[in-house]
C-alpha cells in the first residue's frame, strides 16, 4: 500500500498529488516547482514517487508531504534492473496502478482526499486510476509546445509515422510552428520510430485520452512559443504554467526563500562556485549534457579538445559514471583552463556573473534555465526533444548556435571550438546576448504576479481550493 510521511505544509486547502515519471530529474523538478506555487495559493502538495526513489533521495521538505507507490523494484533501480524501456514501463504500470489506487483510497479514508492528481502523461494509467477513484486529473507536459503538438498530431492521426520535414513544413505553413523544421530538427522519436519504438509509443500515447483530463498544463510560456501555445490551447485546452523554476531566479518576491529545486538525484561537494568567483565576467563556458545522455570515448575526446582549443575557461560536468572515459592526456590538457566536476548546481552556475555561454544538450529544463538567466547557448542535441529545441534556439530565438556533425555523423573538435568562439567572440555575440536577455525578461514577466503563466496557475489553484 502507498505510504505517507508526516505533513510538511501548514495550509488547510485541498490536497494535490504530484506524480512525475520516477527517477527522472527533468520531470520531477518542474512539477515540484508547480507544487510550490500551488502551496502559495493555499493548496497542500504531496509528491508521489517510487519507494526506491524515496529511499535513496532526501525528501524535498516544506511544503511537501511525500507518498510512495511501487514500480515493482522497491530495493533497486527499476530502470537499471530492466534496461529494456518497454519492459520497465509495463512493470511500472502493473505495480504503479495498483499501489496508486491503494494510496488514493487510504488518503480518502484518513480524511485527506486528493482533490486532483497532477501526473506525467508518460504514465497514462495514472489518469485511469484517479478517475476510477473519483479524483480529478491534470496532465503535466514537461516538454515544449512545439514538440508536444507534433506528438499530439500523430496521436490524433493528423500526421502519420514517420513524421517528415514535409509534414513539419505543413505545420509551419498553417502557422502552428514558429519555425520550419528540417531533417535534423523533427523529434527523432517520431522521425525514426523504428530506432526507439518504446519511446516513440510512450511519447505519442501522452495524448491518448488527454481530452478526458480536467486540465492540461505545459511547462512553457506563451511569449516564448506564441503560435505553438495558442494551438495547444485551442486543440487540447492546454495552459502554459512555466518556466517552472525556483522563483528566486524569476525575481518573484512572493516566494523569496525558493532558491533551489529541493530534490536532487545527483549530489556533489565539489567547490565549483569558488572557482567561478575567480573568473572574469562572462568568460566561462558551462558544459553539461544532462543526467541521461552518454558519450563514447571518441566523442568525449573531441568535445574536450574543442573546449581546450577555444581558449576559454570552462566548467565541464562529466558524470561519475562517465569519468573513466576521459584519457589522462585530456585531463591534463583540461587542467590548464578548465575544471571538471561530476555535478554542479546548474542554476547557480548559470546565474553567476562569470558564466558567458552554456554548451548544452538543450534538454527543455536546461534551455529554460539558460533563458531565465539570459545565457547564450551552444546547442549539441542528442535525442528526444533536443534537436527541435536546438533549432528554435538558433533559428527563431537567436540566442545561440548549433554544433554540426560531419558528413559521417561524427563530432569534430574544430566545430566545437568554432561554435564557442562564435558565441563568445564572434560578430553576432552581442545579438545572442541581447536576444537571451530579451527572453529572460519575458520569462520572468510570465511568472510574476499577473503574468500569463501566473494567471493560469492562480486559476488552477482556485479551481481546486473549494
Swiss-Prot record:
The active site is at 27 (proton acceptor), 120 (charge relay). SUPFAM superfamilies: UDP-Glycosyltransferase/glycogen phosphorylase. Keywords: Detoxification, Glycosyltransferase, Nucleotide-binding, Transferase. The keyword Transferase applies. InterPro entries: UDP_glucos_trans, UDP_glycos_trans_CS. It holds the Pfam family UDPGT. GO terms for molecular function: nucleotide binding; quercetin 3-O-glucosyltransferase activity; quercetin 7-O-glucosyltransferase activity; UDP-glycosyltransferase activity. Its EC number is 2.4.1.-. Induction: Induced by exposition to gamma ray. GO terms for biological process: detoxification. It is an enzyme of class 2 (transferase). Changing residue 120 to A: Loss of activity. UDP-alpha-D-glucose binds at residues 27, 142, 291, 343-344, 361, 364-366, 369, 385-386. The keyword Glycosyltransferase applies. GO terms for cellular component: cytoplasm. UDP binds at residues 291, 343-344, 361, 365-366, 369. It comes from the Eukaryota. Belongs to the UDP-glycosyltransferase family. This is UDP-glycosyltransferase 79. The gene is UGT79.
